[in-house]
UniProtKB/Swiss-Prot annotation:
NCBIfam families: D_ala_D_alaTIGR, PRK01966.1-3, PRK01966.1-4
EC category: ligase
Protein name listed in UniProt: D-alanine--D-alanine ligase
Phylogenetic classification of the source organism: Bacteria, Pseudomonadati, Pseudomonadota, Gammaproteobacteria, Alteromonadales
GO molecular function, one term: ATP binding
Primary residence: cytoplasm
General function of this protein: Cell wall formation.
Comment on bound cofactor: Binds 2 magnesium or manganese ions per subunit.
Family in the record: Belongs to the D-alanine--D-alanine ligase family.
Compartmental location: Cytoplasm
Domain ATP-grasp: 124-330
Obligatory cofactor(s): Mg(2+); Mn(2+)
Pathway annotation: Cell wall biogenesis; peptidoglycan biosynthesis
UniProt source species: Shewanella putrefaciens (strain CN-32 / ATCC BAA-453)
Entry superkingdom: Bacteria
């Protein structure tokens, strides 16, 4: 049986570029455990240049092959691609549109689902339309006096707010604000990351995460895990990835009743189905002291770094990551044939 030529594409043009490389390491080591795949790792740098791990400049062509700048190297035909890219152009849905155009099968959510989840405003509209509770919010489309006034009113009404760039991941462009004198500058900073900004009510709650993925034709939702941060912080980019981070994770959250856990999992599956997600996702919730469940966000290509929750929760659920990848890829390629 011939091997599947699998392109592991990583990097991208966002602030999460280096995190994507870390996740790609996990995918690469997992794929290496199977003899089904011939893997070519290619990094997409921040300027849009493709480069192999060996340092060869190359490009992905419309003929579904990697063509090298060094013309003495034969083109490498691509059967399948894993776009291990956090942020732009992976989770935004942009690169999936290109794969669709050239009819190249790929791992993960499709273009529209990726785009809808990455934009926090669009995502919250979908959550509400699906009847899934989420945090109170307003959204702003430009930085001006009216936007500042609206954000200050939200702060006065809610006591504390988060101002977030609508189209960023890993808490990039995300700020907690308790002082009205800081609203204008923070709002300006957030608009520096995205053309739209969402202002959310600060929720004092536990942060729970569910891995939701497809396995043997079934949609699986794991037991909720938990992110536990220092009481004076929220889960910032640095808290997620810095070596000095004080945050810790529990693969299975403690002291969550069976009833609450099942309701969270039901909401997660409802969101996965309703938003037409595919293959994998990490769906994040708040659980308040009053046991109110609020959907926070959906990550359509969750991190797979040494500290990431998705692979840990999948494995804790009894599934092997290499076998999971093989099942998804083979099922997809068989359906294509």
């Amino acid at each position: 049986m011939s091997r599947i030529n699998l392109l592991l594409l990583c990097g991208g043009g966002s602030a999460e570029h280096d995190i994507s490389l870390m996740s790609a390491n996990y995918f690469e080591s997992s794929l290496a455990k199977s003899d089904q795949f011939s893997v070519l790792r290619v990094e997409l740098d921040k300027l849009g240049q493709y480069r192999t791990a060996a340092g060869d400049d190359c490009e992905l062509t419309n003929n579904r092959e990697i063509r090298f700048r060094d013309e003495t190297k034969a083109p490498w035909p691509v059967d399948y691609v894993i776009p291990c890219i956090h942020g732009y152009p992976g989770e935004t849905g942009d690169i999936q549109s290109y794969f669709n155009l050239i009819q190249l099968p790929y791992f993960g959510c499709e273009s529209e689902a990726s785009s809808n989840c990455f934009n926090k405003i669009t995502a919250k509209m979908w959550f509400s339309a699906l009847g899934i509770p989420n945090t109170p919010y307003i959204f702003l489309h430009q930085y001006d006096d009216e936007a500042i006034s609206q954000a200050q009113t939200a702060l006065a009404n809610w006591g504390s707010i988060f101002i977030k760039a609508a189209s960023q991941g890993s808490s990039v462009g995300c700020y907690k604000v308790d002082d009205s004198s800081k609203v204008a500058q923070v709002l300006k900073d957030a608009f520096g990351y995205a053309p739209y900004v969402v202002v959310e009510k600060t929720i004092k709650a536990r942060e729970l995460e569910v891995a939701v993925y497809e396995y043997n034709g079934e949609i699986v939702a794991t037991l909720p895990g938990e992110i536990i941060c220092d009481t004076n912080t929220f889960y910032t980019f640095d808290e997620k990835y810095a070596k000095s981070s004080k945050a810790r994770t529990d693969v299975v959250a403690k002291d969550v009743s069976v009833e609450l856990s099942e309701q969270i999992r039901a909401y997660a599956i409802k969101a996965f189905k309703g938003m037409k997600l595919r293959h994998l996702s990490r769906i994040d919730f708040f659980l308040t002291a009053e046991n109110e469940i609020l959907l926070n966000e959906i990550n359509t290509f969750p991190g797979s770094t040494p500290i990431s929750m998705f692979p840990k929760m999948l494995q804790n659920h009894g599934h092997d990551f290499t076998e999971y990848l093989s099942l998804v890829i083979n099922s997809q390629l068989s359906a294509k044939d």
